[in-house]
Amino acid sequence: QAGRTIRYNLKYGGDYRFMSFRSLLLSGNMVDTQFCYHELPEKLDPFDNETFMHSKTKFYAVCSNVETGSPEYVLCRDMFKDIDFLRASASMPFVSQIVKAGGMKLLDGGITDSIPLTAAFKLGFERNIVVQTRPEGYRKKPARTGWLAKMFYGKYPKFVEAIKQRHLMYNRELDEIEQMRAARRVLVIRPSRSVKIGKMEPNPEIVREMYELGRYDAIAVLDSVKKFLQGDKNEKG
């Protein structure tokens, strides 16, 4: 469904239910659950779940278990039935309610495993492509939300600690990626330049700019991607 994501982002980005503080106040979630995870993919801009279910490609959602402070890697076979895991994987702390799914309490997987490359190798995937959202040289700084994490998630001390230590985990994963990239074990695609875009960017022009940059950078490395997936160990990205 090429173009679907940018299409619905631009079409519905101005709807308060899509992402807004108004939605947070009314529903407890910055991203309205019913609208974004049911009405939109089921009716307004239907997701082709039939093709997804018959695809040979495995799709995993990475979620953070707030009770254990560890990541959960959930194989999704039916996007409509497994939608709560997908929702949890994108539910940012502080602006989302904890998602209960599979007997677990879950939030954004990026808190406990921001770039799950090691997990991909452990799951048996040998030729991995890492798509980064930050340009080369980026390093994550310590967050100033430790006190907020304790206030929101005091019942879950391991998750609070994961939030406090996230920058260390993230930068360690960046180092591991560079080592694997140098050894030609992974191919890395990253933005060719910086774009000032917020996590909850409301400006459609900036969203479009980021999308077009992603397309441009992907096309630029397409031949390298093909060679890498075909097993050319000399291909370095």
Place the predicted regions along the sequence by residue.
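Acidic/polar active-site rim loop that often engages polyanionic ligands
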Residues: 14-24, 64-70, 158
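Flexible, glycine/proline-enriched loop segments at strand-loop-helix junctions
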Residues: 23-31, 70-74, 104-107, 161-164
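Patatin-like phospholipase
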Residues: 1-43, 75, 80-88, 132, ...
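Helix-centered, glycine/charged polyanion-binding patches within enzymatic domains
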Residues: 126-185
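Active-site gating loop/helix substructures
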Residues: 53-131, 135-150, 231
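C-terminal domain-closing interface element
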Residues: 31-54, 168-176, 190-193
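C-terminal helical/tail subdomains of lipid-metabolizing enzymes
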Residues: 173-237
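Structural motif corresponding to alpha-helix initiation and N-cap regions
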Residues: 46, 113-114, 174, 204
